[in-house]
Amino acid sequence: MRKFLLLIAVALFSTATYAQLWSTSISAVAEGDKASQNSPAAMDKDGNLYVTGTKTLPIEFAGNEVGGEDAGAYIAKYNAEGVEQYAIELIGSIDITAITTDAENNLYVAGSFAGGAMIQGVTGEPKTISNEELDSKTATFIAKYSAEGELLAVKSYVATLPSLDIWDPVQVSIAKIVAEGSKVYVEFDYTGNVAVEENLSLSAKYISIDWGFMIYCMVTNNASVVSFDSDFTNPTEIATLAVADNADQCSKLFSFNFDVEGENVYVAALGRGNLVLNSEAFDFAFDGQGSTEKGAILSKVGVKSAKISNISNGNDAEFNTISDIEVRDGKLYIAGTFNETCAFDNEIVAVGASDVFVASVDANELTVDWAVANANDEGETNKYYEAVSAVVFGNESVTVFDAVVDMNNNEAPVAKNYTVSYEGVIAETEEAIAATAVVYNANNIAVINYTNETVVTMYDSALTTTAIESVVAEAENNVIYDITGRRVEKITNAGIYIVNGNKVLVK
């Protein structure tokens, strides 16, 4: 039998980088205070950038002093060249949770608030909204602005108890906004009932636990996508995912995300136990010994749905998240994190507490084309985990902005970036850009970092490569395995693969 030597080198690093265009910062919080790490940003089709954040100081912006020393939130606009346009103060105990723009460059902003709040613009009549909970941001609002900052519309929503037997606090927040065509699609995450309008109420599900001497009702996560006209009228409930009636008490929705293409709404979610999407049931099995499946639910709403099961295990999936999804060219691309095994490929096992994954799914059949993971060992599993801060679905590849987070202080001492080609090849970038928020359009990408200052950096969105990323040689009828013993067809981790006859050596 003829023997041969095959050497395959899979890239350890990608030298692809973004070219910086400009950088600036906003001072909005007093020394010793920290800006909200979860404040989102948006970019319109012309490259105008909208940055949000918390504030405890007046903001000097575009030649004006905006706001006072009271706590609040702000929206600041730059043009594509980094020139300050205007800033808006939102008064009250407010956290901005979602933001986007539409084809006409109108701006949509959502946030959570406690007590009373005032939503205002550069122009337009300010709107006062209220929430009975004074100390907890349990209510939410959504506002529409023109590109010039005129306040056009505001709606607010409060969660109420679905049952008198529930003792836990209930809340509602808006996690994502997508403007598509003449409609605005809004993701509501809630644990209590939400009256959207007189003709539409989102009913929260809860789990009843029989303690023998009493029935305890436990709140659960619910997620709904609701479409509105652009002024937040005519709401229609498109998709709702929640635990089933009489669900096992271990049932749980872990993570939910959605995207819109034309009139089609796509949903991707992670969970376990007994779940229902609209009226369709998805049951992840229990073995009676404390172990359960956990997996993914995918749906082209109203057309087709799919359940993708994970292997059974007994651990909670607190690091199972879907950070972002995008539909393009007949594919649904999904990025997030997982612990133990990946729902989109059970042969992919996390190294450490969690890993980053990207998966490609056929947008019509909802079958998985491929899934890859970064296989990064972040350290002690009871101290560090990985979290995705942002995802860029670029022209040539997906870029994932990853952070290694310290569980003890919630700080991220290590930043890592990964590029994933649309063929499923993953590589770590040689120089990582730390980011707490990233937004982009066809030409530009903006990276925002929040500390006691909001630092904004604009880059050209085209990746520049200065060296060879990988060298690949192929041989017919040979199976190649990576350094963890998994087939290369499933995941291409960094390593040197040497095939000599029937033996495979991995360096």
Identify the meaning behind each predicted range.
Residues 345, 423, 484, 500-501:
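Short strand-turn-strand beta-turns centered on an Asx-Gly dipeptide
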Residues 18-464:
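A sequence-level/structural motif corresponding to short, flexible coil/turn segments enriched
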Residues 2-3, 496-507:
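C-terminal tail/sorting-segment detector
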Residues 487-490:
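C-terminal trimerization/auto-chaperone modules of long, extracellular attachment fibers and adhesins
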Residues 1-22, 468:
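Bacterial Sec-dependent N-terminal signal peptides
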Residues 457-484:
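Residue-level detector of functionally pivotal "anchor" positions at catalytic/ligand-binding pockets or at interdomain
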